[in-house]
Amino acid sequence: MLFLVLLSGLIAAIFSLLDVWYFVRGALVVLKARIQPVVKDLLKEHCYGGIVLPHDLDFLFHMNNSRYLREADFARFAHFTRSGLFQAVRYLGAGMVMAGSTIRYRRSLRLLETFEIRTRLLCWDDKAFYVEQRFVAPKDDFVCAVLLSRQHVIGNSPDKVVQSMCKRKVESPEYPEEVAHWIKYNDASSQQLRAESAVTNSAKDE
């Protein structure tokens, strides 16, 4: 009896302190992607289906803003696994983290509404991959939201990752106009924050 009480307490503590279902679902998404056919075209669009459940809702009974980002995570996990991108990053002893994202909401997703997340690798530079993800309503093919993200490669470079995948050097596609503008915005923001940090540190030294 005592063992069951302690076990229940431990499980309750784990669920209280960790987002357990995020890790469980993420692992299941990757496992499923591993047994699905390999997507050899790195630039091919990948579709990942979803449905709005009660725990996804906000006070207005729409899918809440944070859930879009969460669902986009799972769609990227599936795409990067099936395309071999995750495997290539690990093979090179590198890592990959989200370095920035921008999302634009165009139409709400409601309870029990189905949607597709269409993920595309757009381009890359010497530090990061740039990925677009569209939340599309299958009933009318309307883009309900669009997410642009920067996936920063740590310990290596996107060029080397792609070369490892394709067994040859591959040039990045030309940057779409909106991506080029977004990169400039991020660079300007970084410079501004560095300048503010330098001023703050200088003031502390005085």
Curated annotation (Swiss-Prot):
Signal peptide as annotated in the record: 1-26
InterPro entries according to UniProt: HotDog_dom_sf, THEM6_lcsJ_thioesterase
Pfam families to which the protein is assigned, alphabetical: 4HBT_2 (PF13279)
Localization (cell): Secreted
Residues carrying a glycan: 64
Gene Ontology CC, one term: extracellular region
Keyword annotations: Glycoprotein, Secreted, Signal
Intrachain disulfide bonds: none
Family statement: Belongs to the THEM6 family.
Name the record gives this protein: Protein THEM6
